[in-house]
């Protein structure tokens, strides 16, 4: 087994059917390393994936399988916020591991694992990481429509021909009808002029921008970054999105069209003053894109 590696330049959380899969980037080897225990839990639904992996690892060693010799231990953050040494494999070895674990989910998981980065969401998520590291966000004017358009253009440029462009068609999602296209221009001017001095004012502005839904696609991912920029500028705070359950968030956003109480509660409970913590923002991207995944 390789020695414990403590420092990695990038961290990522992927989600397979609501199962969290942690990963860290190895700059020297230009590869992602993935938590083995997370993947075992995702494809086996074992109540104790750590024990499952321990037994499997022993079995593989006894069988002379060289896979275990390529396992590295990396420091990864756990649910309690502390960092623990975690068995990890690089991508090719994860593929081999999954194929030796008996599971009906094998092919579905591999399809997700191998190809999800090539989807529009996968490509956009990479752009979001780059956006966070580029320094561009510091040049934008938080709370403005132009700021939101610039974020959207960066996230979806080259992926959608409407990246950064205000829609000219009326859209709906499920039973929710967003602002009619013919009223959108004036509606956005109204939202932009809304006050953003207090937390409650900022959340109301966010709720109204969600009701506007100014783009054909990619509204939520762009607007959550937009919200964090306002909070950072006005209150020296931001949202730790990993603290907000996906289903609760989505339900609260739907409800916010008539009653925004719950989204206020969720966002307030997830506020943090760690506005310069790179990991908070990167984790925020992971969860923001997870919110958009179909169940």
Identify the role of each PLM range:
Residues 2-116:
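An anion-engaging/catalytic patch
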């Amino acid at each position: 087994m390789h020695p414990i590696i403590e420092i990695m330049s990038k961290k990522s959380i992927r989600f397979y059917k609501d199962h969290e899969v942690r990963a860290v980037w190895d700059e020297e080897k230009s590869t992602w390393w993935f938590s083995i225990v997370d993947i075992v839990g995702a494809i086996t639904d074992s109540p104790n994936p750590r024990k499952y992996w321990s037994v499997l690892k022993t079995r593989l060693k006894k069988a002379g399988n060289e896979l275990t010799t390529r396992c590295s231990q990396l420091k990864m953050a756990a649910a309690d916020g502390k960092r623990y040494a975690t068995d990890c494999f690089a991508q090719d070895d994860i593929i081999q591991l999954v194929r030796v674990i008996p599971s009906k989910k094998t092919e579905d998981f591999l399809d997700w694992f191998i190809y999800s980065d090539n989807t529009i969401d996968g490509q956009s998520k990479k752009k979001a990481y780059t956006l966070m590291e580029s320094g561009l966000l510091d040049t934008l004017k938080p709370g403005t429509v132009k700021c939101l358009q610039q974020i959207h253009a960066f996230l979806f440029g080259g992926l959608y021909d409407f990246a950064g462009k205000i829609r000219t068609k009326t859209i709906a999602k499920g039973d929710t009808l967003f602002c009619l296209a013919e009223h959108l221009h004036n509606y956005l001017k109204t939202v932009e002029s809304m006050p953003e001095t207090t937390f409650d004012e900022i959340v109301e502005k966010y709720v109204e921008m969600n009701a506007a839904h100014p783009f054909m696609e990619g509204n939520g991912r762009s607007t959550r970054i937009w919200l964090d920029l306002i909070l950072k500028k006005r209150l020296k705070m931001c949202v730790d999105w990993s603290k907000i359950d996906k289903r609760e968030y989505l339900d609260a956003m739907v409800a916010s069209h008539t009653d925004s109480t719950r989204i206020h509660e969720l966002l307030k409970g997830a506020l943090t003053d760690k506005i310069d913590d790179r990991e908070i923002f990167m984790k925020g991207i992971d969860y923001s894109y997870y919110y958009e995944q179909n169940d």
